[in-house]
Amino acid sequence: MQVSRLKNKATALLVALLAYSLIFPAYIFALPQGGQVVAGQADITNPSAVNMQINQATQKAIINWQQFSIAAPEAVNFTQPNAAAIALNRVVGVDPSLIYGSLTANGGVWVINPAGILVGSTGVINVNSF
């Protein structure tokens, strides 16, 4: 009897967490995580808890990410050498990319994610090419 109650409570908690993540998806992730520059030169910094700055020093850069999502209050900004510069962002983790915040760049920003990319109703992408 006691085990049954524990299972019921655990199931109810799991269902509640799942429902919350479906209703409020923008609040279950943070700025892109685990960025590693594998080609070209770029510096990744977080000037604040809701801002990420990527300063790209070469025409082309490739960055591998564990996850690449941007929540509603968050912003990711790429500063590139010029409008023809390209940053290829490869997501190597298992989660889809959820863009509910702002992604800006003066050049091209490409995001490749085998799990998919969703731009939500509050998502803003302002780049030269995407």
Question: What spans do the regions from the language model cover?
Answer:
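Bacterial N-terminal signal peptides that target proteins for export
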Residues: 2-14
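Solvent-exposed adhesion/ligand-recognition segments of exported proteins
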Residues: 3-6, 20, 25-130
